[in-house]
Amino acid sequence: METSSKGLLTQVTQFWNLLDDLAQSDPEGYEKFIQQQLKEGKQLCAAPEPQLCLQTRILKPKEKILFINLCQWTRIPAPQSTTHPVPLTVGKPEDTTEISDAYTVIDVAYNPDVLHAAEKDQVKKNQLIQMAMKCIEEKFQFTLSHSYHITKFRIKGSIQRMKQNLMGIQTDSIDLREKMRRELTLGQIRSSTMSNPDHFPQLLLPKDQVSGKAVCLIEEISSTEIQVEMKMPAYELKIVHDHSEKPLKIELKVELPGINSVSLCDLSVSEDDLLIEVSEKYRLHLNLPKLIDTEMTTAKFIKEKSTLIITMPLV
C-alpha cells in the first residue's frame, strides 16, 4: 500500500511539473488545456434534457399504455462513425396510476448530436425510436406494439423525476454545479499535496446527494441490428369537397405490393396523424392536413390490387 501511495504521489508530482512547464513555455496552450478540462467537467455534470415523447403500448407481460421520453444528454457519447454502435441509456420503468387510467413511463437518453441529426430526417428519427423500443424490450423482457405516435408534449411526467431516474442522484438539493464551484482549485490541490504528501484532497458529496441507485449503464445498439428497415409505400392523399367546395373527408390510397391480406396491416389513427405498419415491410406515418373524426374512419383493403383505402371524415 505504501509503495502504491508513493507511486501515485510521484505521478501527481510529475503531472504538476508538466503543467508548470506548460504554463511557462506555452501560456496559450496551458489556457486551452484548462478550459478544455473545465468544459469536459461541465458536460459530465450536465443533466439530461427532454427532446420528445412518444406513446405506444406494452403488450406483454401485461397490456398497458407506455410513454417513452427521448432525452438528450451530453454524458452519452456520440457514435464514432455511422458504422459504429449508437450509445444510449435506458432508465427504469415507472408505473403511474391516475384517476382515469394507468400507464408506464420509461426515459431513454441519446447524445444531443444524434438527436439533432434526426430532427428533420424522419427515417433517422424512426430508427432511433425503433432502437429505443428494441432496447426496452430486451432489457425488461417486454413485448411492445410497434405502432406509436409522437405526443404534443415533450415529456411525460416532471423533468425532476426524469433526471432522478436517468442520473441516479437527487436533484432537489443544492445544484451539483454549485458543488463544483466549491471544489479545491488546482493550486490548492498542488500546495496541499506537496506540503502533506500523505494527504490527498477529496471532493465529497453530502449524504443527500448520494443515491443508493446505481447509475444506469450505457447500452450500445448496433445499427446493423436494425436492418429490417421498413419501406415507405407509394400513396395518394386527397381532400374530398362537396358541391359548395366545403371539405368533407380525407381519402388515402396506399399501394402495398406483395401484401394479400388485411390482417397483415396495423393501422393507428389519431385526430391529426396516421400510422400504417405492414408485416415489417412497409411503414407510413403522415401528419394529416385537417382534423378527422377517428370514430367514423373506415378502411378497405382491395386484395386484387394490394391497395388499402382509408376514408377519414373531417370533424
Curated annotation (Swiss-Prot):
Pfam families noted in UniProt: PIH1 (PF08190), PIH1_CS (PF18201)
GO cellular component, one term: protein folding chaperone complex
Any one GO biological process: rRNA processing
InterPro entries on file: PIH1/Kintoun_subfamily, PIH1_N, PIH1D1/2/3_CS-like
Highest rank taxon of the organism: Eukaryota
One example GO MF annotation: small GTPase binding
Family recorded in the similarity comment: Belongs to the PIH1 family.
Protein name: PIH1 domain-containing protein 2
Species this protein is from: Homo sapiens
Organism classification: Eukaryota, Metazoa, Chordata, Craniata, Vertebrata
